[in-house]
Amino acid sequence: MTVNTIPNVISGLKLRRSELDIQLLLSSNQDLVKKLKATELDAIIVALNETTQDDDFEILPMFSDDIFLAVNKDSKYADFKDIDLSLLKEETFLTLTKGFATHNDSDIIFKKAGFSPKVALQVNDIFTLISMVSSGVGFALLPGRISAVYESSVKLIPLKQQYHMQQEIGLVFLKSKERDPNLLALIAECRMFASNFKR
């Protein structure tokens, strides 16, 4: 999201409210939700799942994103049209640490495939994970939104239908702050992004 979604939203927000001081925090869903609940953050853009289901939260869905198998460009799987994940039982995988939505989604997909992956490394940021995949250290399950930046070094292969998984990405904020003018500007910008994304 820090590659495309967030920069687009922030540039639009700065046009609306140039005086706004924006600070970004890159972290797991779990950590960001906790900080939002404690009012340490005004709003978060995250994968919408059980961590974001809270009566205190207002949610604005923005877009959906498929999960893919990410492989090095030279991988023997790089030319596959789609992949049956159960064929990769003996392969080495890399994952994000617990608390990240993509980690949780990966667990669900591996369970559907009937195996626990051999995990060589768990990292706490997606950029390190992608870098490791591009270096051939292992494979990963990653959202399609990373492809725009890493298409020269990482190939994203669709999962066969039985393993298909989508992440719903959205803006989450506290209902108690929904009248804040800065937050209203952010909501408007996220709505604009969502409507442009669907075109």
Can you annotate each of these PLM segments?
Residues 1-17, 21-25, 30-33, 178-181:
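N-terminal winged-helix
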Residues 8-12, 30-67, 71, 134, ...:
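Short beta-strand-centered segments that line the small-molecule binding cleft or hinge
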Residues 9-18, 103-116:
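Ligand-binding cleft/hinge of the Venus flytrap
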Residues 15-17, 104, 144-151, 162-199:
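C-terminal effector-binding regulatory domain of bacterial HTH transcription factors
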Residues 20-27, 116-125:
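Short beta-strand-to-loop elements that line the ligand-binding cleft
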Residues 54-60, 65-66, 127-175:
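Beta-alpha-beta core module
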Residues 56-67, 71-93:
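Flexible hinge/capping segments at coil-to-helix
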Residues 77-78, 91-113, 179-187, 197:
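Secondary-structure junction motif
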